[in-house]
Amino acid sequence: MTNPKLDLLQPYPFEKLRAELAKTQYVGDLAPIALSIGEPKHPPPQFVIDALCDTDAMAQHLATYPATRGSDALRQAVADWLHKRFAVNASAEHNILPVNGTREALFAFAQAVLSGQPRSLVGMPNPFYQIYEGAALLAGATPYFLANTANTGYQADFEGVSERIWDATELLYICSPGNPTGHLVSDAQLQRLIELAHRHDFIIAADECYSEIYFSEERRPNSLLAASDAMGNKDFARCVVFHSLSKRSNLPGLRSGFVAGDAPIIEKFLHYR
């Protein structure tokens, strides 16, 4: 006996690609360039390796169960980084929750916040990170795909969504910078989405794992939390962001990240975990 909703899930694309690539034969001495999974190709920071090799510290931490909230020091470090990077004042105690990488967090978040009503919708960009779709389906909701095509400038046309659809929406996943388009959701668009979230009673889950990959200091990607703060929504109501060390710090194997935003929602997510 298994959950029948599992039959709704599509095969994980990266596992399928891995199997197909394993059959490929390469000609010549040049190593192939992998364009399948967004895996960093640079070494991890040395100070992280040094910390992991500190046997005394590791012996102390590995011998005890960690707190689900994470340590006070870790949450404060996240709060300090959010202030330095995005100029927002997030409470280490109430607005931040460390997670084991954002893949599982993005999935689990939907299970924690969706009502389970069969007609509820979860908005998401298309193309998209497959976790968004799976999270919606396993939570009993219906994915609503927002096409990112050449006709829309490779971005979601939020203004083209009807009031009826917004009314049925319980959760909206956005990804900025977007994968695979690289599109940035502007501050004006983020604030418009926050207005819609308040009007139609849904939550925005912003996947910001690519926020530190950019070419110019003048065009650094912004955060949903910063847009929220700038419009006076200083408690980040209905806004939650997901950050990971995988891409920005070349540490996908560490499975380390955090979720930050609306304090009551973070508390509910902590209760779920």
Q: Which sequence ranges carry the predicted segments?
A:
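N-terminal small-domain helix-loop-helix segment of the aminotransferase-like
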Residues: 2-104, 108
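Helix C-cap/helix->beta junction micro-motif
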Residues: 28, 139, 199-200
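Residue-level marker for buried hydrophobic side chains located in beta-strands
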Residues: 204-205
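Conserved core segment of the aminotransferase class I/II
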Residues: 226-273
